[in-house]
Amino acid sequence: MKIAKILAAAALCLSVCSAAFAAPAVKTFDVHEGSVKIDVPQIKGAAGGKFADNKINNTLNFYVLKQLYTALPLSMRNDDVMRTAYNKTFKAKDGSEDAREFVEDVAGFVNFKLRCDLEDVKQYGGTSVSSYDLQGQYNVHFKGDNYLSVEQRGYIYTGGAHGMTLFNAATFDLNTGREVELADLFKNGSNYLERINKVVAAKIAEDSRMFFGPVEVKDGDRFYIQDGKNLVIAYPPYEVAPYAAGVVTFAIPLDGLSDILAVDIK
């Protein structure tokens, strides 16, 4: 009888421990307002609890807001001002819920503006285009116990030969909810940029004609973790290559950087 109780207690302990360290769930929050259709990732169950969930979701919502603002005049698109105002407004414990409502409101306004812009072109310039639109999707590249990597892509079309591809990648610490910078992954004083750039240079040498010139990876460049195996440095169209090249990515095996990694990516 005692053995049965011990085994039951052990099983319960294992189930609780597994739940405590399980990767978070990622669900889709749909923003569909007429010609604006964006799928927004929202997480629940980060290791850092609701505080981390809220912080991560707030950041993901902000990046969607940036996509929406591409449809607005340049005078309304100062990233630093936007982020400061956004963080001040939605920094509360449950601010991500209010932020989602705000994103929906902005999407409604953007949809209205796109419709008005198209009608103006039809009236004064003429066009065979049936709609202007803004679409967005996301892809979870890595969801582990400690880190989450998400890519958010969008596409806005407002006439012309082609639209504009929108791209962002972000990696989060699931314990704190903080967005991770490239430097955070490596030991202090390590030559991580030199090592990464060596791999990138070798890949470019295989087909240098598609690039504008040499590519130098810097702190602040976009990146994501792919399946816990690769560090992927990513650049939107026009940043390092022509539009036709799409989003340019360089996959660097983490095994080759294991001696200078400061974190356990799992």
Question: Model regions: which residues?
Answer:
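Compositionally biased intrinsically disordered regions enriched in Thr/Gly
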Residues: 20-266
